[in-house]
Amino acid sequence: MDVAANPRIHPTALISPEAELAADVQIGPFVIVEGPVRIGPGCVLRAKAHLIGPLTMGRNNVVYDNVVIGERPQHFQYKDEPTGVEIGDNNVFRENVTIHRGTTHSWMTRIGNDN
């Protein structure tokens, strides 16, 4: 795990050794960060959030309780191809949101800024 400076990580959180966290990231209780996930400065992951890589998250995003980002898509066309999620800056993901990876080889689910 590439951790810059001192992010605040709750002791019950599980963070992949492949994860890269910016210095001021805050990670709450029972959060899971799985696989190659890059989390930018100012991001907050609240209780029980689950992020699955490949996933890149920009600056100042807030992920509320029970959000899942990066899971395999619920689509018959998906055949376990390498896909992922890219998230911009200043987004808020409220409770229980799910965001799946792209469906076809090399496709990314992309979420821009200020959502």
What are these regions (language model features)?
Residues 105-106:
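Internal nucleotide-binding/catalytic subdomain
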Residues 1-9:
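Generic start-of-chain signal for non-secretory N-termini
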Residues 7, 13, 19, 24-27, ...:
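A structural motif detector for beta-strand N-caps
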Residues 81:
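Glycine-rich NAD(P)-binding loop of Rossmann-like domains
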